[in-house]
Regions:
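Cleaved targeting-peptide boundary
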Residues: 18-29
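N-terminal signal peptide c-region/cleavage motif recognized by signal peptidases
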Residues: 14-16
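Generic anion/oxyanion-binding catalytic loop in active/binding sites
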Residues: 8, 24, 95
Length: 165
């Protein structure tokens, strides 16, 4: 394990992190330019159209990925109350190398999850309402991916009441 990766793990253990922030990237706040300034040019860039909006996806792999991460994917383009913001981070997906983000490390870093789902394939997903989804392997010990987004409600809000007559 490299020294930087070890420091990263220790930092996560020592201080609880906001689920929607990792490695200087916070969905809904961080811009394309800020990601480029911090991580450089991506290994791969695509421009998918999602729900009619032009979006941007950057993938950092191999030597371009942060220490301890096999692949980091940053999706840009966020629909906000103020309109569509093509330069804001929508999602950050981390695919850690084995043993980088074990279940206890994730819980120590982000706290107790708000919900847990057991998947049909034997894996599990831990969900934090402030924007983190952590997928764990069949043994339930090692994370296979961490997906960070803007905070999400666990239960959809009720539709507004019909106007009174």
């Amino acid at each position: 394990m490299t020294r930087l990766a070890l420091l990263l793990v220790l930092a996560l253990i020592a201080v609880p992190a906001a689920a929607s922030d990792w490695g200087g990237i916070e969905p809904g706040v961080t811009t394309v330019d800020q990601v480029r300034d911090r991580y450089g040019r991506p290994s791969k860039e695509t421009r998918p159209k999602i729900e009619g909006y032009d979006t941007l996806q950057w993938v950092y792999e191999g030597d371009q990925a942060p220490a301890g991460i096999a692949r980091m994917t940053v999706d840009f383009g966020l629909l906000t109350a103020g309109g569509y913001k093509p330069n804001l981070v929508r999602l950050l997906t981390l695919e850690p190398k084995p043993f980088m983000f074990g279940k206890s490390t994730v819980i120590q870093g982000w706290g107790v999850p708000d919900a847990v789902a057991d998947n049909k394939d034997g894996t599990s997903t831990y969900i934090w309402k402030d924007g983190l989804l952590a997928h764990f392997d069949k043994e339930g010990k090692d994370s296979t991916s961490l997906i960070l987004s803007v905070p999400q409600p666990l239960v959809p809000s009720a539709p507004p009441a019909a106007p009174k007559k």
